[in-house]
Regions:
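Central antiparallel beta-sheet cores of small beta-barrel/beta-sandwich binding domains
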Residues: 11-139
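N-terminal signal peptide c-region/cleavage motif recognized by signal peptidases
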Residues: 4-6
Length: 139
């Protein structure tokens, strides 16, 4: 039995998070920054940007360990050739990569697995926990 007010380790991260993905330019590939919402529930992160099945869509999922470490999986659809690296990559092409992240109670940081040196680039992730809604609980 848990004491009132005591959170399980995974629950300390639960809540709404603002996710910022930043990919710098590399060679002729333009850089970009995306901001999108994410949610951690029962120690599992899920974030989405865009419309599923459409160019520019990105979905990120993964379990956060009790110490805040996480290996997240990203799956998406290329928005535009100008932002994608690779010889055979164009708008509408599916892609995926892993993210190594570290969460604290109100913030987190992550880095994209760069993949092949010629094709990949060092994208970073910033996670910021959002305040609980003022409508939650009593007003």
């Amino acid at each position: 039995m848990l004491m009132p007010g005591v959170l399980l380790a995974g629950e300390k991260f639960d809540g709404s998070w603002l996710t910022t993905l930043t990919c710098p330019e590399k060679g002729k590939t333009e850089g970009y920054t995306w901001k999108f919402p994410g949610v951690i529930k029962d120690g599992v992160y899920h974030g989405e940007r865009g419309t599923a099945g459409q160019p520019g869509y990105l979905s990120i999922d993964g379990k956060i360990a009790d110490d805040g470490s996480a290996k997240l999986s990203a799956n998406g659809i290329v928005a535009s050739r100008q932002y994608a690296r690779g010889v055979f990559v164009g708008q509408g092409t599916d892609y995926s990569y892993n993210i190594k992240a570290q969460f604290k109670e109100t913030e987190g940081k992550g880095t994209r697995d760069e993949g092949l040196g010629l094709v990949g680039r060092p994208c970073t992730f910033d996670f910021v926990k959002q305040p609980a809604s003022s409508q939650a609980g009593g007003r």
